[in-house]
Amino acid sequence: MYAATPETPFGSARSQPVITRSVSQRYNHPGQSNHHHLLHSLSFNHQNVLALPAAAREPPVDVKINDIAGNSIAGILYKWVNYGKGWRPRWFVLQDGVLSYYKIKGPDKIVVIHETEKGSRVIGEESTRMISRNKRHAATNNTNHQLRRKPFGEVHLKVSSIRESRSDDKRFSIFTGTKRLHLRAETREDREAWIEALQAVKDMFPRMSNCELMAPTNNLDISIEKLRLRLVEEGVSESAIQDCEQITRSEFSAIQSQLLLLKQKQWLLIDTLRQLETEKVDLENTVVDETQRQAGNGDSEETISESDDDNEQFDEAEEEMDTCDSLSSSSFKSIGSVFRTSSFSSDDDGLTNGFESENDDVDPSIKTIGFNYPHVKRRKKLPDPVEKEKSVSLWSMIKDNIGKDLTKVCLPVYFNEPLSSLQKCFEDLEYSYLLDQASEWGKRGNNLMRILNVAAFAVSGYASTEGRICKPFNPMLGETYEADYPDKGLRFFSEKVSHHPMIVACHCDGTGWKFWGDSNLKSKFWGRSIQLDPIGLLTLQFDDGEIVQWSKVTTSIYNLILGKLYCDHYGTMKIEGNGEYSCKLKFKEQSMIDRNPHQVQGIVEDKNGKTVARLFGKWDESIHYVMVDQGKVNESHLLWKRNKQPENPTKYNLTRFGITLNELTPGLKEKLPPTDSRLRPDQRYLEKGEYEMGNAEKLRLEQRQRQAREMQERGWKPKWFRKEKGSETYRYIGGYWEARDSGSWDDCPDIFGQVHQSIK
């Protein structure tokens, strides 16, 4: 793909943007020629839309990044690999807007000498000494070092951000959007030199403004003036000439607008392609490295190999919550062995209470709490589809929506699952028995076990998202959902309370506790991935008055263009309240080839900040805890384990619990208000596999939904929730279950039309 050149000894000459004359006048570096480099196919100096005579056009001056920032920067930096290897030296080269790195030890090492780095600026005394040592060695052995290996990894600075460590003046990190590179220089001065060089090159890639993207209008004036002179010579009347000028300017303006939109889309796609190129190189190098490792060492689990993404295991010490200090790797070796050898059993229904053989010391009466409710028979599978689903490319649907708000994008029902966002809120309460047990622990005076169970509940809500790649239905304004589950000892209710921004509020009455909250997702569409940042607070109140609050972590969906779609959750979750203990949970971000994804680690602290317990596990499997006694790690115990998946999984990968959420049990339809999600026609058609009818109804409801903003602007208010005074949080005002008992739905809006009456 790239041709090797004398200026690029690593054989990776890359395309570079061409910068206009004004930039070249600011940065004048004569003698630094790079004529062998490939020029970027897109020039910052765009051609005029209207053709001009050659004399009227000034040729652009091609200035490359190395002309501005000098020739390549090179030197040794220490890169964080993993907890087994720690910091390892790598030879880094900054050239053509790309930071590449190479191994300097082992069979894949490169040998750097003065001739191969001629013209490069070398940072660091250690780097200079290494070049000198290699030069003497090369002279003694008469070795040819011109053949260079491919880089072990690459980072494109245009799509990366640089961050300096606040706790260590030698460290910094580079975030590419998909991974983070943790680096450490030899001295503080070396770090400053690297940061300055990296930032200087990154500044060469400014985001193009609209005025830069649009063609210059002064050339248009010249062309129109020439057109006027020609028409005058032909004897055309003044009114006709003015009409021609107006038509020309109007057409030119329209073309400019179209060009602007096309260029913006083009640059977004270029960003995406650069990231894909980097990931391709990373994956190829990792596959080669793993193949060589397995060939030499077999499949031993004790061997720790480096992959380019292993640094994802390392968390910045200056982050808001860093469990690395309190959750040392040595302490987790013993915990991990217990975790791996634990024997998990489950009953025929795939339901467990999270306390098994390794928790025999727990009071048996606690184990049964949350499981002593009356049994209710519910469905175990979705209806068989009536129609065969069409194959539709997700990329073909989203490529025109790069940069847009996802909440405004209308997709066919093929990309939905037969649940609404209101029902998804209730799905987070699948393991509500943990709150029942937390309530009981508090009654018995054990507030530590209470906070541990609350933490396990906060994690358990993410278990159902594993393998779920379809989008839930966006509720209509005023849409509601009820869940009366006596078999779980709770009643749940939710309502869409705002259209823009899209906010869903919920309230749940459990056994000894109440739970409420609202959710507003802030979405970012990166072309190849979607990032969802939850905005809102979840509140849990026990009958004894203790209140606990937390917020959800970030969720991202990856591989929208290439590869298998998957979602990941990452960030820090703080669980705090007016009780004796608080908890901090760290959801670790998954790398592209992570061998142990979905990890969660956390600590429980008392009011004095002393760590009294630790948690670990995976959000899609189980959570364990260990008590901390004067710094000693005790035996681990199981808090929560995910229920078994259905015997016949659905195409949507719904859990056993999720399959029941949209069910119309006998006699339920007559009790529901006309706003309930179970009566939404497009969602019901999708569940039954009637895709054509589902698409038609979805389009009809989307058109109806466009009136929601006008309704909201006219002062529309939700029926069952109100904002708390002095707060943006919505609280349930009551009255729903009373109206349900009396069947008083006359004042409820018919948001779906009359179609729901025919749904069976």
Swiss-Prot record:
GO CC terms in record: cytosol; membrane
PH domain segment(s): 70-203
Region (Conserved): 495-501
Top-level taxon of origin: Eukaryota
Coiled coil: 268-322
Keywords for this protein: Coiled coil, Lipid transport, Lipid-binding, Transport
Cross-referenced Pfam families: Oxysterol_BP, PH_11
InterPro entries, sorted: OSBP_sf, Oxysterol-bd, PH-like_dom_sf, PH_domain
Entry function: May be involved in the transport of sterols.
Name by which UniProt lists this protein: Oxysterol-binding protein-related protein 1A
Organism: Arabidopsis thaliana (Mouse-ear cress)
Gene, per the UniProt record: ORP1A
